[in-house]
Amino acid sequence: MSRGPPDSGMFPSFEVVPAVDVQDGRVVQLVGGERGTGREYGDPTAAARRWVDAGAETLHLVDLDGAFEGDRANADALEAVVEAVDVDVQFGGGIRTAHDACRLLETGVDRVILGTAAVEDPAIVGAVGEDFPDSVVVSLDAKGGEVVVSGWTEGTGLDPAEAAARYETEGAAAILFTDVDVEGRMEGVRSDEVARVVEAVDIPVVASGGVSTLEDVRTLKETGAAAVVVGTALYEGAFTLAEANRV
């Protein structure tokens, strides 16, 4: 039996969220979070419109160059995506300060995803949330059982479930949990890791990493996750967004 996600205006019911990860101005899907891996899938705005036309209610937009290097080389491409769609956009990648986060929220992004910045300064969560309630998602990317930061290159020693509970107390509106070890590999999910995070908090948990089949989507739904981010499986046509939304 599915535990069911917490009541939330963010995700009123379980949702499948297409990923639009941008590197050098193009959509890419990395394997295991490693630079130079994976495949390219074209123009970000075209991809975003494709998923909205297919029924997406939320888009997961990530600036990979920002995540790895902290630069804003993709700023124009990312802004074009936000302006082109009329659905919720959650944005992450290279957001290092409360000023960065607030500026994005002021210019049309619905939710900001804080990863490295939240680990380095947990108070940033409350600082942004005070001005923009229900708009801060804390990203916990796990590799080898610990939270990793700085483009998935540095270990922190933090346990994902324990970290999730801490950020809930800091004011996070949701947790994005990414299993980097299986990200982009199309080899399936590790639902026990997701379930640990879900059980640690009373805010929505968005699961990401490893989805390759509709059964993977169903498995993550049954953990009580509020939503699942799907990238490679959708781009490669393993299933359609409509099929996933019927799970």
Where are these regions (language model features)?
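Structural preference for beta-strand elements that scaffold enzyme active sites
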Residues: 15-19, 57-58, 86-90, 110-113, ...
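Haloarchaeal acidic low-complexity proteome signature biased toward cell-envelope/secretome components but also
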Residues: 1-17, 244-247
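Alpha-helix-loop-beta-strand connector modules within alpha/beta enzyme cores
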Residues: 70-90, 126-141, 187-212
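Glycine/small-residue-rich loop that forms an oxyanion/phosphate-binding "nest" at active or ligand-binding sites
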Residues: 62-65, 70-130
